[in-house]
């Protein structure tokens, strides 16, 4: 069982929602390069890794989040380095330093942080998605953003969480 946060200031993705999400993403996860942009406890990125992702980059600005992530990595006997990287940046700085080719980018910011447009535009501008890559944005309401270079192609609701799915548009 993974360590997680206590209290209501932080809202981890429910087990049910996480399982449903990765059942949808089953074909895209095996062998994938994954960026878990607001990783929190790391539950989403760890799920991707457990389902065969070849590389996972975890990022969070919160030192408390990274402390819990590191406990979870240790509990699962996952070492950081080659396949698993841990970053401590704000989301814009993290996106700025990444190289392209992510098959899956998971964006699960605190609900109070309205960063959807900025994050998605930066992903397009930097060319961070692989050709068939997917961005999944989790928020407390549908994310109805139209971003040039991305196609919003699906949305699912699980309890209080909405997952909005984007893929790169072809020219």
Where are the regions a protein language model picked out?
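Class I S-adenosyl-L-methionine-dependent methyltransferase catalytic core
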Residues: 1-171
């Amino acid at each position: 069982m993974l360590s997680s946060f206590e209290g209501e200031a932080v809202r981890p993705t429910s087990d049910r929602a996480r399982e449903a999400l990765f059942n949808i993403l089953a074909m895209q996860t095996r062998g994938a390069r994954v960026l878990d942009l607001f990783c929190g406890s790391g539950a989403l990125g760890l799920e991707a890794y457990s389902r065969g992702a070849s590389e996972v980059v975890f990022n969070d600005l919160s030192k408390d989040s990274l402390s819990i992530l590191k406990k979870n990595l240790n509990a699962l006997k996952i070492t950081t380095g080659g396949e698993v990287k841990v970053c401590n940046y704000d989301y814009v700085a993290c996106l700025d330093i990444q190289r392209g080719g992510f098959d899956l980018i998971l964006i699960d910011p605190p609900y109070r942080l309205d960063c959807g447009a900025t994050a998605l535009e930066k992903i397009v501008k930097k060319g961070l998605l692989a050709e068939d890559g997917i961005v999944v944005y989790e928020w407390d309401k549908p994310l109805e953003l139209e971003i040039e270079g991305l196609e919003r192609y699906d949305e699912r609701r699980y309890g209080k969480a909405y997952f909005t799915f984007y893929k790169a548009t072809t020219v």
